[in-house]
Amino acid sequence: MYRSYSLLILFSLFNCLSAESQFTATDWPNWRGLTSDGQAKLVDGLPTEWSQTKNVVWKTFIPGRGHSTPTLVGNHIYLATADEDEMFQSVVCLNKLDGKMIWQTKVHEGQFAVGLNKHASHAGTTVVHDGERLYVNFVIGSQAYASALGLDGKLIWQKPIGKYKVHQGYGSSPMVFGNIVVVKADTKIGGAICGLDKKTGREIWRQERPKFPNYTTPVVIESAGKQQMVFCGCELITSLDPLTGAKLWEVSGSTQECVSTLVTDGTHIFVSGGWPKNHTAAIVADGSGRVAWKNSARVYVPSMLIRDDFLYVTMDAGFAICWNAKTGEEQWKERLGGAFYTSPVMVGNRIYGSNLSGKTFVFEANPNEFKLIAANQLGNEVYASPIVSGDRLYLRVAFKGDERKEFLYAIGKN
């Protein structure tokens, strides 16, 4: 039994490393990118300025509505979307080179969940690519589901995660580790986090969760000499073994509702949430529960970025701020304007962050001073976070008017 369990762990770790090796530095296979921290490799030629006509390689109409961030692997882009008139949720696949749609697969049809916040959508999670399959989470009616699709768009399996009562919406994306896809659905009627077999959807492990709504996506970090899957929310910061679901440690220290995904410097994890209280903190990632520092800044929806011992944040209320990651000391704070429901991306020493009204700010990751490089307007509503691949930036934006329409733009020098 022990030998079989050990072989399972070794095999899963091998497959995890093999899957990562399938991707290149220009791939963006899951929420927050290849390294799950919102950072991309700097490539010469990535624009800092654009408009509806300037530096637009292509734009493509995206049917329906969604906050799903683009997923990009090789020459293909994947998005989740929801048609609120026809009542179906789907995944679309586009050609990266010209933006043309290759396929669209209906994943769910039927009565949508009720009670969404006006800033939420019925396609709020990001598609995950593991090199062989696609994984996506949706809530339909009163049930949360995880689904797997082939790269040709054909549905492979579908698994109910559990009953789901909408409070704000649903935004926890799948996470892949080894042979397991992890899915989470925190809800005020009692949720769960599960490890499913990637090939079949069979449940391998399950942990019941507190009766609180929460929207975070787990990430795997290496700390204290082990791989830990860490996430916050439900008034807890939790670390699980991603292969077995075993609880490594869990401490109080978060607020109930968190949307942002935590980041780490290897020894600390940086968490934030925004309801019913604002909470941002640096926690020592050893299970001790020791808080290195904390403050009451509202970083509810946007996720943080970390570079060279400094944290960079686009706050919900429209400020950019830089903190010393070791001490929490504020380096600078600057008003950008508008509200932010997206997470910024970092490319080298540049940060790209889009506000709700469609303006994307480009500024330096510089702890000594705030320096704005450019501010670019595209569309008039943005909920999906930008991604970067090579010398192109991809923006999912909406134009509101008599008829609201969404588009995906490929921004590159032309």
Task: Name every feature range the model reports, one short phrase each.
Residues 1-4:
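Positively charged n-region of N-terminal signal peptides that target proteins for export
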Residues 6-16:
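Bacterial N-terminal signal peptides
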Residues 19-414:
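Noncatalytic, solvent-exposed loop/strand surfaces
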